Amino acid sequence: MATKKGTRKRRVKKNIETGVAHIHSTFNNTLIMITDVQGNAVAWSSAGVLGFKGSRKSTPFAAQMASEAAAKQAMEHGMKTVEVEVKGPGSGRESAIRALQTTGLEVTAIRDVTPVPHNGSRPPKRRRV
């Protein structure tokens, strides 16, 4: 079967002033997604995408690099101000927020939206190292 050549969609440059930066920080990785106010994705990045593998993905430095990469993508679309929503218990939370501020995006609000169970499912067993 013949494959089509060069039929990929071109990325349309949007002009978005304000957005929401969703930082999902787990124990193993940090994901940053920058959306517009409605929730449509503008830019995203993660520690794994940038080449960090294994235990290096969970470091604050990897979260900082991922945050800078996502912020640069969003600024190409004209973004200037962001609200930050942080979710999860990971180590890259603060460094990701700081990296957003240093790249030139103005952070207007920081919200912690970590889901807290009302005694939901049983947590994983304690590690014995």
Swiss-Prot record:
Gene3D superfamilies linked to this entry: Ribosomal protein S11 (3.30.420.80)
Pfam families, per the entry: Ribosomal_S11 (PF00411)
Keywords on record: Ribonucleoprotein, Ribosomal protein, RNA-binding, rRNA-binding
One GO cellular component term: ribonucleoprotein complex
GO BP of this protein: translation
GO MF annotation terms: rRNA binding; structural constituent of ribosome
Function according to Swiss-Prot or TrEMBL: Located on the platform of the 30S subunit, it bridges several disparate RNA helices of the 16S rRNA. Forms part of the Shine-Dalgarno cleft in the 70S ribosome.
Recorded family membership: Belongs to the universal ribosomal protein uS11 family.
HAMAP family, alphabetized: Ribosomal_uS11
Subunit organization: Part of the 30S ribosomal subunit. Interacts with proteins S7 and S18. Binds to IF-3.
Protein name: Small ribosomal subunit protein uS11
Organism: Limosilactobacillus fermentum (strain NBRC 3956 / LMG 18251) (Lactobacillus fermentum)
Protein's gene: rpsK
